[in-house]
C-alpha cells in the first residue's frame, strides 16, 4: 500500500481541523480548539489503488511559525486552506502560506482549498462581511489564486455538510500518484520570497 503524506496549512480558524475530522470520522466537531499539531490517518482507494493517507494538521497561529515547518519534510502534497467567508485568510494564501511552503518544500504539489462553502450564501455571514465592506471569496477568485500560486487544483468544500470533502482528498492523492497530470509552470520564476 502506497503511503502519502498530506500536510494541511492555513490561517487559524479557517476549518483545517474540522476538514480532517469530518473526512476521517464522518462527524463534524462541536467546539473550536486551536491545534498545535495533530496527525490523522485514513486508508482509502483512489482509482483502484489502496492508499494510506497520512494527514498532518498544523497550527495556523503566528505563535507556531517556527514550529510548523518541522512537519514539512517528506510531504507529498500540501493543502493550503482559506475560509471562503474570510477574505483576510484568502489574502494570506500568497501573503504567508505559499511563500512558507516554497521556502521549506519547493516543488511539492499544492491543492488550494476554500473551506466553509456552506457559509457563502448564509445571510448573517454576508451581512457581517458587508458591514466591513467585504464579501465572501468567489469561485472565480479562487481559480485566479490557484493560477497565481501554480497550484494543481482549486477546490471548495464544507466540512459541515461534507459537500466536496472527499474530492479534496481524492485530488490530493491523484496529484501524487499521477504526477504527469500536474500543471507545468508557465514560466521558470519559481518562488518569490519578499
From Swiss-Prot:
GO molecular function list = GTP binding; GTPase activity; protein kinase binding
Q: What is this protein called?
A: Rho-related protein rac1B
* NCBIfam families given in the database record: small_GTP (TIGR00231)
What residue intervals hold the motif Effector region?
32-40
The protein's location, in the record's own words, is: Cell membrane
- For this chain's UniProt record, which GO biological process terms are given? actin filament organization; aggregation involved in sorocarp development; chemotaxis to folate; cortical cytoskeleton organization; endocytosis; establishment or maintenance of cell polarity; mitotic cytokinesis; positive regulation of actin filament polymerization
> Pfam families from the xrefs?
Ras
Indicate the family of this protein.
Belongs to the small GTPase superfamily. Rho family.
Topology class, membrane: Lipid-anchor
